[in-house]
């Protein structure tokens, strides 16, 4: 169903009010004096196709956010919810600054491991952020954010099958000036953001320094640790230099550092119910949460109510640290009056640590601890030419990245499962003899550096390790030609070659003292190489200077790779996957109506995925048992419709509406639908609903300003909504998410060079939780369970700038 009937009346009524009110206002204006000042919607210039052009002239589904960055309650990228249809930008709370991105139902299968590439690119000043850690950028000194929906493979390359979030910061102005923003709020929120511009050599060199510091005491009481969580401690500082030695050359160099010592933002509630608290499932595919988890039974760390908790109880604090050093260069050289060379390059070096209490209970049951090092380098060289009736962009792109990850699972979990092996010398020696590669102990290996097993008080840990290098290069071309003043043709193509070299250690059991020794009994050493072509063609018809229709066909691909979240060599070798491909047909209508007071954009799309990468259940051909596999498992069709409307109702009032409808369906998908029946039957599962594809998104709100004294009062309010979503691959009841709502608002007073703003977030104080069940079956309780603490409660703050 492309259009959600539940919201049809609301949307139709809203648009009718927009247009009807517009006609009334236009009629009233005609009766005013001829010299009355006109008003309307400001034009926004974007670089969605690598060249500067009006957003309304771009035959791409794009939302450009500019003024809202300064006047609305956008603290960071996660607050863009509701500003663009079919777009969800959330926090992935198990990584520092981690992003959970979803555009038109396209989202990463998982974001916790650097071996997985995301299908949506986050760019900052032309640099692709290659890991999800640190992608939730803080909002200050941002010139604009462009959200491009649909495959953008021709100009932006690999891993853009869902779209692109393009963030552009301001350049040094070359004049003395400063902006300062200080914020205080609930739960000890303290923020300080500053940017200072200054000339160095007049007309030749300009500079800018910037800094952001954020602290927060946390909002969720932890009754086990006796404090609030998660605490936030974030810093970003750096400088930019703008070189303009002559009229032809320009270069901006930015050097910066991020230091995020915050707790992991995605806190969990315990979902370890005691016997009989939850209702027994009727679906035989569902884990029986009415039976107590092992964490509850063995340690008494039980949850005794179905009500969403108002506290956390994990016994290990979710400590984290992310340090990032980055260098970005943007340079251009004017060749002729209408052509130039452009270079964009940069490096990013990330060091990441995190530990989280995986069972989310007061029991010392299981923790996961990870150390990551990640480096990336990219270079892009473009030739751009714009004439009266054509635009040409051609270029070369190079990418290299490398990561290393150590991770350890600890707590009492492995002692519960393999304590007899760890503490019995004969069994420990036998386990060392098989090295986890075959025999009765496979896939478990035991540390060859420890003789006689572990002591009774030792914590049994499992050690894992992986490292990967990725390198790709691409050549691309995009050309647009105006046949006449009505019709334009667009065609583009990109050729990409990429290889990945992956090494992972055979997991083994050891103790805490030796958890970083890397004493692996064996390694998986894997290599893959691909080359792909990503084309795009389109036609644009200009009805008049304010209205256009376009139709386009574009393709993109998401890189193949290796499933890094495995424990043994055999599974690493099995879980290699090829690229997935998107083929998107899009029809759009863009318009400025009512004398430039109503901007109305409509889009319909049909995005077909082939070889979609997915984790599914299949029969192992060797052991004849069922197990989870990661591979190119499905073909999926995403269809939808989008409305974007911005209406200047009066000189002082603007209304906006953003609605996206999505219908996702499998065209082909095979898996074991009932993993607990013991049959291991892999069958057609195309009747299931693809996960993480919300039925709709909605954002509606207003901005009102009025002159008061020597200044101006401005009120901004936004309501956003996300529809029903399946978070479970098998559409289990436990994974059915009913959707979420959010209301935020702010009121500010602006005068000359200062302002004060009062803001509120989650004003309806909505709460929800989404459970994750580990282990168990229809006839047995889980090993342990947790649920994501969905939203921070209602909060207020005040900002001075």
Regions found by a protein language model. Give the residues of each.
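Membrane-embedded beta-barrel scaffold of Gram-negative outer-membrane proteins
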Residues: 330-334, 340-346, 351-356, 542, ...
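Solvent-exposed loop segments that connect transmembrane elements
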Residues: 220-228, 265-313, 357-368, 408-465, ...
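Outer-membrane beta-barrel domain signature, strongest for Gram-negative TonB-dependent receptors
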Residues: 226, 232-393, 399-404, 599-601
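Outer-membrane beta-barrel translocator/receptor signature
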Residues: 118-119, 131, 140-143, 149, ...
């Amino acid at each position: 169903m492309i259009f959600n009937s539940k919201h049809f009346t609301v949307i139709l009524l809203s648009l009718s009010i927009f247009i009807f009110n517009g006609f009334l206002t236009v009629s009233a204006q005609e009766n005013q004096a001829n010299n009355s000042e006109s008003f309307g919607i400001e034009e926004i210039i974007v670089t969605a196709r690598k060249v500067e052009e009006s957003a309304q002239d771009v035959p791409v589904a794009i939302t450009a956010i500019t003024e809202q960055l300064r006047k609305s309650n956008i603290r960071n990228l996660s607050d863009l919810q509701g500003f663009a249809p079919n777009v969800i930008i959330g926090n992935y709370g198990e990584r520092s600054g981690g992003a959970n991105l979803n555009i038109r139902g396209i989202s990463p299968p998982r974001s916790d491991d650097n071996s997985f590439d995301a299908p949506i690119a986050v760019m900052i000043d032309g640099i692709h952020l290659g890991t999800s850690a640190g992608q939730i950028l803080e909002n200050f000194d941002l010139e604009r954010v462009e959200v491009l929906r649909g495959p953008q493979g021709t100009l932006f390359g690999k891993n853009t099958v869902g779209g692109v979030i393009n963030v552009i910061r301001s350049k040094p102005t070359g004049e003395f000036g400063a902006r300062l923003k200080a914020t205080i709020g609930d739960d000890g929120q303290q923020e300080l953001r500053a940017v200072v511009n200054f000339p160095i050599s007049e007309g030749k060199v300009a500079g800018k320094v910037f800094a952001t510091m954020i602290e927060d005491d946390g909002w969720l009481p932890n009754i086990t640790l006796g404090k609030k969580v998660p605490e936030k401690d974030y810093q970003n500082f750096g400088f930019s230099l703008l070189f303009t030695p002559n009229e032809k050359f320009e270069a901006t160099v930015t050097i910066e550092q991020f230091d995020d010592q915050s707790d992991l933002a995605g806190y969990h509630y315990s979902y370890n119910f005691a016997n009989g608290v939850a209702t027994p499932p009727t679906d035989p595919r569902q884990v029986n949460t009415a039976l107590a988890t092992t964490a509850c039974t063995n340690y008494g760390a039980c949850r005794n109510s179905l009500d969403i908790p108002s506290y956390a109880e994990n016994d290990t604090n979710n400590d984290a640290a992310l340090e990032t050093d980055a260098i970005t260069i943007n340079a251009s050289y004017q060749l002729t009056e209408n052509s130039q060379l452009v270079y964009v390059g940069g490096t990013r070096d990330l060091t990441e640590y995190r530990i989280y209490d995986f069972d989310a209970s007061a029991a010392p049951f299981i923790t996961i601890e990870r150390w990551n090092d990640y480096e990336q380098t990219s270079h892009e060289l473009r030739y751009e030419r714009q004439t009266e009736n054509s635009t040409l962009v051609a270029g070369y792109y190079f990418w290299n990245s490398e990561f290393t990850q150590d991770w350890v699972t600890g707590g009492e979990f492995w002692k519960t499962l393999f304590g007899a092996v760890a503490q019995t010398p004969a069994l420990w020696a036998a386990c060392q003899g098989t090295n986890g590669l075959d025999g009765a102990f496979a896939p478990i290996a035991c540390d060859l550096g420890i003789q006689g097993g572990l002591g009774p008080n030792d914590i049994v840990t499992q050690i894992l390790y992986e490292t990967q290098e990725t390198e790709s290069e691409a050549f691309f071309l995009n050309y647009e030609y105006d046949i006449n003043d009505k019709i334009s043709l667009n065609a583009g193509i990109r050729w990409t070659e990429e290889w990945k070299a992956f090494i992972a250690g055979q997991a083994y059991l050891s103790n805490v003292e030796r958890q970083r020794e890397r004493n692996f009994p064996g390694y998986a050493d894997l290599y893959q190489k691909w080359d792909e072509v990503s084309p795009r063609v389109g036609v644009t018809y200009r009805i008049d200077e304010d209205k256009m229709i376009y139709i386009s066909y574009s393709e993109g691909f998401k890189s193949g790779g290796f499933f890094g979240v495995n424990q043994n060599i055999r599974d690493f070798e099995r879980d290699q996957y090829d690229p997935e491909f998107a083929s998107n047909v899009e029809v759009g209508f863009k318009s400025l109506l009512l004398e430039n007071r109503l901007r109305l954009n409509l889009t319909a799309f049909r995005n077909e995925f082939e070889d979609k990468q997915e984790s599914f259940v299949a029969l192992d051909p060797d052991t004849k048992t069922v197990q989870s596999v990661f591979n190119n498992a499905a073909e999926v069709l995403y269809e939808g419709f989008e409305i974007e409307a911005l209406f200047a109702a009066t000189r002082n009032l603007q209304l906006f509406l953003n609605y996206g409808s999505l219908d996702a369906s499998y065209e082909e998908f095979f898996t074991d639908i009932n993993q607990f029946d013991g049959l291991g039957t892999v069958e057609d599962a195309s009747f299931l609903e693809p996960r993480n594809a919300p039925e709709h998104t909605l954002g509606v709100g207003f901005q009102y300003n009025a002159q008061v004294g020597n200044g101006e009062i401005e009120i901004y309010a936004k309501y956003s909504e996300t529809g029903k979503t399946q978070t479970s691959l098998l559409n289990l009841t436990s994974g059915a998410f009913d959707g979420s709502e959010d209301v935020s608002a702010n009121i500010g007073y602006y005068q000359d060079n200062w302002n004060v703003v009062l803001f509120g977030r989650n004003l309806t104080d909505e709460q929800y939780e989404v459970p994750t069940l580990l282990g168990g079956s229809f006839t047995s309780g889980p090993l342990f369970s947790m649920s994501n603490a969905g939203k921070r409660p209602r909060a207020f703050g005040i900002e001075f700038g």
